[in-house]
């Protein structure tokens, strides 16, 4: 029953799938008005996402791309200041991407 409730809850959420074409250019990241230091964001991400270097098919069978985005977003909003997280973007490949905005 718990698994069915979780599956139904996730099924009602919206994920955006994007295909990306890329180009190469340069840009210097300099913004004294950043809302949060990038180092702090990295620390939060490492704490919330225990998925690094895992085989999601074998180690975490629950996940498909959209579910990974929902999992990360739900846990990141608990770590960050209110209304700071805009979206979570998962790159399956360079051209296949899932975007979750908490909707």
Curated annotation (Swiss-Prot):
Q: Which cofactor does it need?
A: Zn(2+)
Could you say which EC number(s) this protein's record lists?
4.2.3.12
Question: GO terms for molecular function, please?
Answer: 6-pyruvoyltetrahydropterin synthase activity; metal ion binding
The reply to whether Ribosomal protein figures as a keyword in the UniProt entry is no
List residues modified as N-acetylalanine. Answer: 1
- Annotated metabolic or biological route of this protein: Cofactor biosynthesis; tetrahydrobiopterin biosynthesis; tetrahydrobiopterin from 7,8-dihydroneopterin triphosphate: step 1/3
Q: Which Pfam families match?
A: PTPS
Q: Which residues form the active site?
A: 53, 92
Which residues does the record give as Zn(2+) binding sites? 27
Catalysis: reaction(s) = 7,8-dihydroneopterin 3'-triphosphate = 6-pyruvoyl-5,6,7,8-tetrahydropterin + triphosphate + H(+)
- Highest taxon, organism lineage: Eukaryota
How does the cofactor bind to this protein, according to its record? Binds 1 zinc ion per subunit.
* Enzyme class per UniProt: lyase
Identify one Gene Ontology CC term for this UniProt entry.
Answer: mitochondrion
Keywords noted in UniProt: Acetylation, Lyase, Metal-binding, Tetrahydrobiopterin biosynthesis, Zinc
Please list the GO biological process terms of this entry. tetrahydrobiopterin biosynthetic process
Something else the entry says is:
Two isoforms of this protein have been found.
Subunit composition? Answer: Homohexamer formed of two homotrimers in a head to head fashion.
Role according to the record: Involved in the biosynthesis of tetrahydrobiopterin, an essential cofactor of aromatic amino acid hydroxylases. Catalyzes the transformation of 7,8-dihydroneopterin triphosphate into 6-pyruvoyl tetrahydropterin.
- State the family named in the UniProt similarity comment for this chain: Belongs to the PTPS family.
| Name listed for the protein in its UniProt record | 6-pyruvoyl tetrahydrobiopterin synthase
Organism annotation: Salmo salar (Atlantic salmon)
């Amino acid at each position: 029953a718990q698994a069915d409730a979780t599956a139904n809850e996730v099924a009602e959420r919206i994920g955006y799938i994007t295909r990306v074409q890329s180009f190469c250019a340069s840009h210097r990241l300099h913004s004294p008005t950043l809302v949060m230091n990038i180092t702090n964001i990295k620390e939060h991400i490492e704490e919330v996402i225990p998925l690094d270097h895992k085989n999601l098919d074998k180690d975490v069978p629950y996940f498909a791309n959209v579910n990974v985005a929902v999992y990360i977003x739900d846990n990141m909003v608990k770590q960050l200041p209110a209304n700071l997280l805009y979206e979570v973007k998962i790159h399956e490949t360079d051209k296949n991407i899932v975007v979750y905005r908490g909707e």
